[in-house]
Amino acid sequence: MTQDEMKKAAGWAALEYVTKGSIVGVGTGSTVNHFIDALETRKEEIKGAVSSSVASTERLEKLGIPVFEANEVAGLDIYVDGADEINAEYDMIKGGGAALTREKIVAAISDKFICIVDDTKQVDVLGQFPLPVEVIPMARSFIGRELVKLGGDPEYREGVVTDNGNIIIDVHNMAITDAKDMEKKINALPGVVTVGLFAARGADVLLVGAPEGVRKFEK
Protein backbone atom coordinates (compact mmCIF):
# COMPACT_ATOMS: atom_id res chain seq x y z
CA MET A 1 0.00 0.00 0.00
CA THR A 2 1.42 3.40 -1.00
CA GLN A 3 1.52 6.38 1.34
CA ASP A 4 -1.33 8.02 -0.56
CA GLU A 5 -3.40 4.84 -0.32
CA MET A 6 -2.87 4.83 3.45
CA LYS A 7 -3.99 8.47 3.60
CA LYS A 8 -7.07 7.58 1.57
CA ALA A 9 -7.93 4.68 3.88
CA ALA A 10 -7.71 6.95 6.95
CA GLY A 11 -9.79 9.64 5.25
CA TRP A 12 -12.58 7.27 4.31
CA ALA A 13 -12.54 5.68 7.79
CA ALA A 14 -13.50 9.05 9.29
CA LEU A 15 -16.90 8.83 7.59
CA GLU A 16 -17.95 6.56 10.45
CA TYR A 17 -18.08 9.63 12.72
CA VAL A 18 -20.25 11.77 10.45
CA THR A 19 -23.81 11.99 11.76
CA LYS A 20 -26.96 12.71 9.80
CA GLY A 21 -28.04 16.36 9.76
CA SER A 22 -24.73 17.65 11.10
CA ILE A 23 -22.30 20.34 10.00
CA VAL A 24 -18.83 18.82 9.76
CA GLY A 25 -15.58 20.60 10.62
CA VAL A 26 -13.08 20.02 7.82
CA GLY A 27 -9.33 20.56 7.98
CA THR A 28 -6.72 21.03 5.29
CA GLY A 29 -4.16 18.90 3.48
CA SER A 30 -3.62 15.85 1.31
CA THR A 31 -5.19 13.37 3.76
CA VAL A 32 -8.17 15.66 4.36
CA ASN A 33 -8.70 15.89 0.61
CA HIS A 34 -9.49 12.17 0.67
CA PHE A 35 -11.97 12.77 3.51
CA ILE A 36 -13.64 15.55 1.51
CA ASP A 37 -13.96 13.21 -1.46
CA ALA A 38 -15.49 10.59 0.84
CA LEU A 39 -17.83 13.18 2.36
CA GLU A 40 -19.34 13.76 -1.08
CA THR A 41 -20.98 10.32 -0.78
CA ARG A 42 -22.84 11.56 2.33
CA LYS A 43 -23.58 15.13 1.22
CA GLU A 44 -27.33 14.54 1.01
CA GLU A 45 -27.34 13.49 4.69
CA ILE A 46 -25.45 16.47 6.15
CA LYS A 47 -26.18 20.18 6.31
CA GLY A 48 -22.67 21.07 5.16
CA ALA A 49 -19.21 21.87 6.47
CA VAL A 50 -17.10 24.52 8.17
CA SER A 51 -13.74 24.71 6.42
CA SER A 52 -10.33 25.67 7.79
CA SER A 53 -8.88 27.02 4.54
CA VAL A 54 -9.63 28.54 1.16
CA ALA A 55 -8.27 25.38 -0.50
CA SER A 56 -10.64 23.06 1.40
CA THR A 57 -13.57 25.43 0.81
CA GLU A 58 -12.95 25.31 -2.92
CA ARG A 59 -12.80 21.51 -2.92
CA LEU A 60 -15.98 21.20 -0.84
CA GLU A 61 -17.93 23.63 -3.01
CA LYS A 62 -16.73 21.94 -6.19
CA LEU A 63 -18.27 18.71 -4.88
CA GLY A 64 -21.53 20.44 -4.01
CA ILE A 65 -21.10 20.45 -0.23
CA PRO A 66 -22.40 23.69 1.37
CA VAL A 67 -19.77 25.61 3.35
CA PHE A 68 -20.66 27.67 6.43
CA GLU A 69 -18.57 30.32 8.16
CA ALA A 70 -17.36 29.49 11.67
CA ASN A 71 -19.29 32.53 12.94
CA GLU A 72 -22.54 31.01 11.67
CA VAL A 73 -22.42 27.97 13.96
CA ALA A 74 -22.56 27.63 17.73
CA GLY A 75 -20.45 24.48 17.65
CA LEU A 76 -19.63 21.34 15.70
CA ASP A 77 -19.88 17.65 16.57
CA ILE A 78 -16.64 16.69 14.87
CA TYR A 79 -13.56 18.18 13.27
CA VAL A 80 -11.59 15.99 10.88
CA ASP A 81 -8.01 16.97 10.08
CA GLY A 82 -4.57 15.54 9.47
CA ALA A 83 -1.27 16.18 11.22
CA ASP A 84 2.37 16.54 10.28
CA GLU A 85 3.33 14.68 13.47
CA ILE A 86 1.38 13.15 16.36
CA ASN A 87 2.70 11.60 19.58
CA ALA A 88 1.30 9.06 22.02
CA GLU A 89 -0.47 11.81 24.01
CA TYR A 90 -2.28 12.92 20.81
CA ASP A 91 -0.36 16.20 20.78
CA MET A 92 0.28 17.31 17.20
CA ILE A 93 2.39 19.49 14.97
CA LYS A 94 0.21 20.97 12.25
CA GLY A 95 0.57 23.81 9.78
CA GLY A 96 2.66 22.39 6.97
CA GLY A 97 -0.05 23.74 4.69
CA ALA A 98 -0.04 27.15 6.45
CA ALA A 99 -3.66 26.85 7.63
CA LEU A 100 -2.85 26.37 11.33
CA THR A 101 -4.76 29.33 12.78
CA ARG A 102 -8.05 28.53 11.10
CA GLU A 103 -7.53 24.84 11.85
CA LYS A 104 -7.11 25.70 15.53
CA ILE A 105 -10.29 27.81 15.52
CA VAL A 106 -12.43 25.08 13.93
CA ALA A 107 -10.93 22.49 16.30
CA ALA A 108 -11.80 24.73 19.27
CA ILE A 109 -15.50 24.87 18.38
CA SER A 110 -15.75 21.11 17.84
CA ASP A 111 -16.71 18.49 20.42
CA LYS A 112 -14.46 15.79 18.95
CA PHE A 113 -11.19 16.10 17.01
CA ILE A 114 -10.61 13.17 14.66
CA CYS A 115 -7.03 13.07 13.40
CA ILE A 116 -6.43 11.17 10.16
CA VAL A 117 -2.85 10.27 9.19
CA ASP A 118 -0.70 7.67 7.50
CA ASP A 119 1.63 5.71 9.76
CA THR A 120 4.69 7.85 8.95
CA LYS A 121 3.22 10.68 11.06
CA GLN A 122 3.37 8.86 14.42
CA VAL A 123 6.41 9.90 16.48
CA ASP A 124 7.76 9.46 19.99
CA VAL A 125 8.93 13.08 20.31
CA LEU A 126 7.53 16.02 18.35
CA GLY A 127 9.88 18.28 16.43
CA GLN A 128 11.51 16.39 13.60
CA PHE A 129 8.98 18.07 11.32
CA PRO A 130 9.62 21.85 11.37
CA LEU A 131 7.23 23.61 13.74
CA PRO A 132 5.20 26.30 11.91
CA VAL A 133 4.43 29.61 13.59
CA GLU A 134 2.03 32.13 12.02
CA VAL A 135 3.39 35.62 12.62
CA ILE A 136 2.29 39.19 11.89
CA PRO A 137 4.84 40.41 9.29
CA MET A 138 6.27 43.32 11.32
CA ALA A 139 7.21 40.90 14.13
CA ARG A 140 9.21 38.52 11.93
CA SER A 141 12.72 39.41 13.15
CA PHE A 142 11.70 39.72 16.80
CA ILE A 143 9.93 36.36 16.80
CA GLY A 144 12.88 34.75 15.06
CA ARG A 145 15.21 35.91 17.85
CA GLU A 146 12.79 34.71 20.54
CA LEU A 147 12.49 31.28 18.92
CA VAL A 148 16.28 30.94 18.98
CA LYS A 149 16.14 31.58 22.75
CA LEU A 150 13.65 28.70 23.02
CA GLY A 151 16.16 26.38 21.38
CA GLY A 152 14.95 26.43 17.80
CA ASP A 153 16.42 27.25 14.41
CA PRO A 154 13.82 29.52 12.76
CA GLU A 155 13.45 29.84 9.00
CA TYR A 156 11.17 32.27 7.17
CA ARG A 157 8.94 30.38 4.73
CA GLU A 158 9.62 32.36 1.57
CA GLY A 159 6.73 33.22 -0.72
CA VAL A 160 3.98 32.00 1.62
CA VAL A 161 1.16 34.25 2.81
CA THR A 162 -1.51 32.68 5.00
CA ASP A 163 -5.24 33.01 4.33
CA ASN A 164 -5.13 35.65 7.09
CA GLY A 165 -2.44 37.71 5.33
CA ASN A 166 0.41 36.73 7.64
CA ILE A 167 3.75 34.93 7.29
CA ILE A 168 5.04 31.56 8.47
CA ILE A 169 8.25 30.90 10.37
CA ASP A 170 9.27 27.22 10.48
CA VAL A 171 11.27 26.20 13.54
CA HIS A 172 13.80 23.41 12.99
CA ASN A 173 15.75 21.23 15.41
CA MET A 174 13.37 21.32 18.36
CA ALA A 175 12.78 18.20 20.44
CA ILE A 176 9.45 19.06 22.05
CA THR A 177 9.02 16.97 25.18
CA ASP A 178 6.38 19.21 26.80
CA ALA A 179 4.11 20.30 23.97
CA LYS A 180 1.56 22.10 26.16
CA ASP A 181 4.24 24.25 27.79
CA MET A 182 5.94 25.07 24.49
CA GLU A 183 2.59 25.95 22.90
CA LYS A 184 1.88 28.36 25.76
CA LYS A 185 5.34 29.99 25.60
CA ILE A 186 5.29 30.59 21.84
CA ASN A 187 1.67 31.77 21.78
CA ALA A 188 2.54 34.35 24.46
CA LEU A 189 5.08 36.13 22.23
CA PRO A 190 3.76 39.46 20.88
CA GLY A 191 3.25 39.14 17.14
CA VAL A 192 2.54 35.42 17.13
CA VAL A 193 -0.92 34.64 15.79
CA THR A 194 -0.60 30.99 16.76
CA VAL A 195 1.91 28.16 16.82
CA GLY A 196 1.30 24.86 15.05
CA LEU A 197 1.33 22.88 18.29
CA PHE A 198 -2.05 21.33 19.00
CA ALA A 199 -1.59 20.19 22.60
CA ALA A 200 -3.92 22.35 24.69
CA ARG A 201 -6.58 20.99 22.34
CA GLY A 202 -5.21 17.74 20.95
CA ALA A 203 -6.92 14.92 19.10
CA ASP A 204 -9.62 12.72 20.64
CA VAL A 205 -9.60 10.00 17.99
CA LEU A 206 -6.65 8.88 15.85
CA LEU A 207 -7.18 6.98 12.61
CA VAL A 208 -3.92 5.69 11.16
CA GLY A 209 -3.71 4.38 7.62
CA ALA A 210 -1.19 1.53 7.64
CA PRO A 211 -0.18 -1.26 5.23
CA GLU A 212 -2.47 -3.71 7.02
CA GLY A 213 -5.44 -1.30 7.11
CA VAL A 214 -6.68 1.46 9.42
CA ARG A 215 -5.66 1.44 13.07
CA LYS A 216 -8.06 3.22 15.42
CA PHE A 217 -7.14 4.81 18.75
CA GLU A 218 -9.38 6.77 21.12
CA LYS A 219 -8.63 8.72 24.30
From Swiss-Prot:
Reactions catalysed according to its record: aldehydo-D-ribose 5-phosphate = D-ribulose 5-phosphate
Keywords: Isomerase
Pfam families the record matches: Rib_5-P_isom_A
EC identifiers of the protein: 5.3.1.6
Binding positions (substrate): T28, G29, S30, T31, D81, G82, A83, D84, K94, G95, G96, G97, K121
InterPro entries given in the database record: NagB/RpiA_transferase-like, Ribose5P_isomerase_typA_subgr, Ribose5P_isomerase_type_A
GO MF terms held by the record: ribose-5-phosphate isomerase activity
Catalytic site: E103
Superkingdom per UniProt: Bacteria
Gene Ontology cellular-component annotations: cytosol
GO BP terms in the entry: D-ribose metabolic process; pentose-phosphate shunt, non-oxidative branch
Pathway as given in its UniProt record: Carbohydrate degradation; pentose phosphate pathway; D-ribose 5-phosphate from D-ribulose 5-phosphate (non-oxidative stage): step 1/1
Subunit and interaction comment: Homodimer.
Function: Catalyzes the reversible conversion of ribose-5-phosphate to ribulose 5-phosphate.
UniProt-listed PANTHER family: RIBOSE-5-PHOSPHATE ISOMERASE
Family: Belongs to the ribose 5-phosphate isomerase family.
Name this protein carries in UniProt: Ribose-5-phosphate isomerase A
Source species of the chain: Photobacterium profundum (strain SS9)
Gene this chain is encoded by: rpiA
